[in-house]
Amino acid sequence: MYLKTVQLRSFRNYREQQVNFESQKTIIVGNNAQGKSNLLEAVELLATLKSHRVSRDRDLVLEGATTGQILATLERAYGLAELGLILRVSGRRTVILNQEPLRRQLDFLGVLNAVQFSSLDLDLVRGSPESRRSWIDTLLVQLEPIYAHILSQYYQVLKQRNALLKKIRQQEEDSQNPSLSSEQLSNDISQLKLWDSQLAETGSRVTRRRARVLERLTPLAQKWHANISGKTEQLEIQYMPNVNWTEDEPMQVQQAFLEKIEKRRIAEQQLGTTVVGPHRDEIEFIINQTPAKYYGSQGQQRTLVLALKLAELHLIEEVVGEPPLLLLDDVLAELDPHRQNQLLDAIEDRFQTLITTTHLNSFETKWLKSSQILSIDGGQIRDF
């Protein structure tokens, strides 16, 4: 796939900007806070309908405007695709494919695939479990767009179940009050059983897919990790689901959920929140039989994240049948020359790559000669 053009209107600090991509590699050079990351964020939004920086659409719209717009033309093996995303300060966003507004955002996902690698990703190893769950979920959405719906269903069930648990806890705290209806409490506990089965059903879909994708990603990451580390380090990736299960069979996984929910029922009612489910999953990275989160050096952690990103690229290509875009956001400065060369050699001309940087010193002459170089200043992009 090849991204031909991107047009931004009232997006972040861009009032009106069109970018034509004329090479397999594009380097965007400029000082900090000029809009480099915003351009890559726009491409990321077209790929995943999510930003890894903010959660509200209003934060993506230029200050003073009511709507922002991202338009793009993409060349796929099957032909051209025109992508559009309208973001609103208030109200729902609109997704447009080939000039037709789509009723379901799900139908937009999977048209453009991209792997984002920013300096924020270097926190993937030492960061919170939530950051690792978000990482694997973003990859899954690109490999299997229906997963976005599956994940959304799970979190809707979780929200409703938490609200009911909170209500039950409040009723139990007020149980000394003679005016409180024990019948109401009994009804709520009966209703909780219905949410238990919903949680087990939707949660099992999430956990089974996470396990499957990590099973496919791990050997690719291990191969890249061995190459980058000079085969001096051995990488293991362990999926640690909150609900343990052994066989990838829907009913058995659901049963494992229900059994754990039953075991934790009293604790959940006392806490007023759900403690069972994939929202509490963990993914552990181990280097030479030692958890990288606690003991990995900064260099080891960067090698690990670089291996993960290269594995993502190749897994998406394997599943989708076309190489995805690679978005490198100010990350080269964070890597030493050896890791920079490993990354640049791995990319070659196989993946269309957009790279942001504050200076061109990191690039070899041959790379600069084969790249389109753009400069950016105050939300204005020009040829370098």
Swiss-Prot record:
Pfam families: SMC_N. ATP binds at G30, N31, N32, A33, Q34, G35, K36, S37. One of its GO terms (biological process) is double-strand break repair. GO terms for molecular function: ATP binding; single-stranded DNA binding. It comes from the Bacteria. GO terms for cellular component: cytoplasm. SUPFAM superfamilies: P-loop containing nucleoside triphosphate hydrolases. It is found in: Cytoplasm. Belongs to the RecF family. This is DNA replication and repair protein RecF. The gene is recF.
